[in-house]
Amino acid sequence: MKYAVIGNPIDHSLSPVMHNANFAALNDLSSYEAINIRNEDFHRIKEIINDKALSGFNVTIPHKERIIPYLDEIDEQSKTVGAVNTVKIVDGKWIGYNTDGIGYVTGLRQVYPDLEDAYILILGAGGASKGLANELKKFVRPKLTVANRSMDRFESWQLEVNKISLQEAEAALSEFDIIINTTPAGMNQNKEVIINLDNLDSHTLVSDIVYVPFKTPILEIAEAKGNPIHNGLDMFVYQGAESYRIWTGELPQIQIMKDTVLKYL
């Protein structure tokens, strides 16, 4: 079987080394590659994928929403989030899934197993935030709180959450057990910290969905204050593991996937 990840740009993606390491560990002859598809070429997506004879593929930035009109079906998570990151091809039928939420929450539960009574603040109200919130609601009793710079961003939200501004979040920071950054702040060379952590309680876990850099500025500040931190590596690995399960019905070698990615960070 052949699989791939599509995006633009895609050269930086660690998905091929992660998935190919898993295939090798399972003595599976399948392969996984990265395919760069420019926005202006996306109308040829069916032709490009069919020419590669893929059995499934992952979708990353900026195509997670753009792919939806080309799919025959999408799962409930994808409908809620409005984005797809995994496609399974069965007898020519394209079925879309979103594994970001389950990937993140599975990783979070490794470091914070007692989620049930946690008060959680999510920073950002984009697609990633929606996916995480939708999955977290299955495990957490207190209503989730989502903070964003612009309140207009909440207009597309169907989920029942507390919606507050970043200023309100800063004032109430000490009330939360877990704070999750889902914004691009801190990615690559971006040194922005989206929220002031002065009011952070010492017990609060600070998490970021980014894994490059390994410690974003918000995580560095939290760690310097003595708080536990959690980056996006687990989310990346577990969403990939869930993609593999969707494609094959089998369980992957998760530790090998994680160890392989760590070698490149």
From Swiss-Prot:
Any one Pfam family match given in the protein's UniProt record, by short name: Shikimate_dh_N
Recorded catalytic activity of this chain's protein: shikimate + NADP(+) = 3-dehydroshikimate + NADPH + H(+)
EC number: 1.1.1.25
Keyword Cell division on entry: no
Origin superkingdom: Bacteria
Active-site residues (renumbered): 64 (proton acceptor)
Gene Ontology MF: a single term: NADP binding
GO CC annotation terms, alphabetical: cytosol
Any GO BP: shikimate metabolic process
EC top class, as a word: oxidoreductase
Keywords: Amino-acid biosynthesis, Aromatic amino acid biosynthesis, NADP, Oxidoreductase
Residue sites binding shikimate per the record: 13-15, 60, 85, 100, 211
Involved pathway(s): Metabolic intermediate biosynthesis; chorismate biosynthesis; chorismate from D-erythrose 4-phosphate and phosphoenolpyruvate: step 4/7
Similarity-based family: Belongs to the shikimate dehydrogenase family.
NCBIfam families attached to this UniProt entry: aroE (TIGR00507)
Function: Involved in the biosynthesis of the chorismate, which leads to the biosynthesis of aromatic amino acids. Catalyzes the reversible NADPH linked reduction of 3-dehydroshikimate (DHSA) to yield shikimate (SA).
Name used for this protein in its record: Shikimate dehydrogenase (NADP(+))
Organism of derivation: Staphylococcus saprophyticus subsp. saprophyticus (strain ATCC 15305 / DSM 20229 / NCIMB 8711 / NCTC 7292 / S-41)
Name of the gene encoding the protein in the UniProt record: aroE
